[in-house]
Amino acid sequence: MEVHMIIDFHTHAFPDALAMRTMEKLSQNSGFAPAGNGTVAGTLKSMRECGIDKSVICNIATNAKQTKNVNRFAVSANEHPELISFGSVHPESDYESELDFLKESGIIGIKLHPDYQQFFINDPKVTPLYEAILKRGFILIFHTGKDVGVGEPTHAAPDRSREVLPMFRGEKVVFAHMGGFLMWEEAEILLGEDIYLDTSGCPQLLAPEKITDMILRHNPKKILFATDYPWENPKTGLEYIRSLPLADEVKRGILGENARTLLNSNGAEL
């Protein structure tokens, strides 16, 4: 297959002072052994080893008090040209002013994690938050499905996610983990909708024939390669996508061109 730009649309990194402690806690809670140390330097090293050109860092403000610190780190990570760092806002934070700061700082996307941030994706109380994000033109990526490190209830189960689709039509919205981590049968109700889906969390858990079917039933141009690094070895994710029985053009799109088009539409200039 001809080599084109490879973009990992879903990774995580933490400030050096917090990375070791954070990774230990997350690994203990989830039962997953990480493939990296959670630092920016570790992410860049992994990218070089795997041939990944760009990575999106999905930062998460897990409570209102940490929102500013999370976003200052997000801005600093963008000093590395290989990284495209997204910000995050908590529903209970002063998100209007924080979104303005992020916009002025060149951040082009926002990550929300309903489980960590303790809101149901279809709760009308968060509609103003969605509107504030989208009216500023941000790309919006959600964790969807289960999170084994958090437990029940699942705040962004596919049936709940489907309820918010009308407000996202025509917007740049990504549902991570193919629409529902560990809930892929239920996530079929999202296929064909006007959203992007990313492939993070799928290689070792979602059968190749199943994800191939989902990709073809959705819109292959709205599928984004993603690894959730450091929770997945990017080499595993790359091999998984490259092995799927899809046309080379479709694979090139998934591995980078789809993300490149989306990111460039928000000024990334890739």
Language model segments and positions:
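Mid-to-C-terminal alpha-helical segments outside catalytic/metal-binding sites
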Residues: 2-12, 18-54, 217-222, 235-270
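Hydrophobic faces of well-ordered beta-strands that scaffold small-molecule active sites
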Residues: 7-11, 55-57, 84-87, 108-112, ...
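Conserved, mostly hydrophobic/aromatic
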Residues: 10, 47, 74, 102, ...
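Short aromatic-enriched loop/helix-cap "lid" or pocket-rim segments at secondary-structure transitions
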Residues: 17-22, 68-70, 98-99, 153-154, ...
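Divalent metal-binding pocket/active-site signature
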Residues: 36-37, 61-65, 91-93, 105-187
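Acidic (Asp/Glu)-rich catalytic clusters
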Residues: 44-51, 71-82, 98-107, 127-136, ...
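Short, well-structured secondary-structure segments
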Residues: 51-66, 73-75, 80-90, 111
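Active-site-adjacent C-terminal substructures of enzyme catalytic domains
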Residues: 167-172, 179-237, 243-249
